[in-house]
């Protein structure tokens, strides 16, 4: 039980340190040269996701990262830029997350799909030429689970994870890199690879519970189109 408490403390400490780092990034962006007039973009995004959950203790059948559930995400994006190399990007959308347990030897193949409404608030740093630029995004993200679905055959070796999740609210950090092309008349076309890590656990992690931690990791490839409205 002492090991479980240590792992929880480490996870929380990492979360605090990352949030502090994001605050420093945001503070640094405010010190950048300002534009004569702020730029405002509004658009939509969509793409594919791959996700898993890091259970402690581990769940059998989840060690093959090539056998993770594939889902999708989509939503709206708003970007406000008052500086030459950075902006604030806020999104609101839907995302599928979850995990898969698979074993050809034992004959089970189970998938839990969790449907979330997510809201990332990101510092957007861009660099490059006038029409084609690279960028990276970093910031906190909150999400709320609106639906949980199960499919496939369950295993018998470990069954605690088949309970309904205890925590519908999730929070974590998101970071991404990508490229975008911008044209005054055609708008902005953006391609991004993003990773999200949840600091919140799906299940209760007190001393009396089975799991010391149950944190999600989600990767996504997204395409976005934005129109400059100002």
Mark where each language-model region is.
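Cleavable N-terminal export/targeting peptides
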Residues: 1-38, 228-230
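Extracellular loop and loop/strand-boundary signature of outer-membrane beta-barrel proteins
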Residues: 60-65, 104-110, 157-165, 206-212
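Surface-exposed strand-loop-strand hairpins of Gram-negative outer-membrane beta-barrel proteins
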Residues: 49-74
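Gram-negative (and chloroplast) outer-membrane scaffold detector with strong preference
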Residues: 32, 36-40, 48-54, 79-153, ...
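Short, hydrophobic/amphipathic alpha-helical packing segments
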Residues: 71-75, 120, 174
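Short sequence motifs at beta-strands and strand-loop junctions characteristic
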Residues: 36, 66-71, 111-116, 165-171, ...
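Predominantly the C-terminal beta-signal and adjacent terminal strand-loop region
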Residues: 164-170, 175, 179-230
């Amino acid at each position: 039980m002492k090991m479980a408490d240590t792992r929880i403390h480490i996870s929380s400490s990492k979360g605090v340190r990352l949030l502090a780092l994001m605050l420093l990034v945001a503070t640094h962006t405010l010190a950048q040269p300002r534009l004569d007039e702020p730029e405002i973009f509004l658009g939509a995004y969509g793409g594919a996701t791959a996700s898993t959950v890091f259970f402690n203790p581990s769940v059998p059948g989840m060690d093959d990262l090539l056998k993770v559930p594939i889902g999708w995400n989509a939503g709206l994006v708003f970007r406000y830029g008052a500086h030459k190399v950075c902006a604030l990007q806020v999104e609101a959308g839907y995302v599928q997350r979850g995990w898969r347990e698979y074993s050809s030897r034992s004959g089970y193949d189970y998938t839990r799909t969790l449907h979330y409404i997510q809201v990332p608030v990101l510092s957007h740093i861009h660099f490059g030429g006038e029409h084609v630029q690279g960028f990276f995004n970093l910031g906190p993200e909150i999400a709320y689970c609106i639906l949980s679905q199960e499919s496939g055959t369950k295993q018998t070796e470990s069954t605690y994870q088949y309970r309904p999740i205890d925590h519908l609210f999730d929070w974590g950090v998101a970071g991404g890199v990508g490229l975008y092309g911008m044209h005054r008349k055609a708008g902005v076309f953006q391609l991004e690879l993003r990773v999200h890590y949840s600091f919140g656990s799906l299940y209760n992690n007190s001393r009396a519970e089975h799991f010391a931690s149950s944190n999600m990791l989600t990767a996504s490839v997204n395409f976005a189109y934005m129109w400059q409205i100002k």
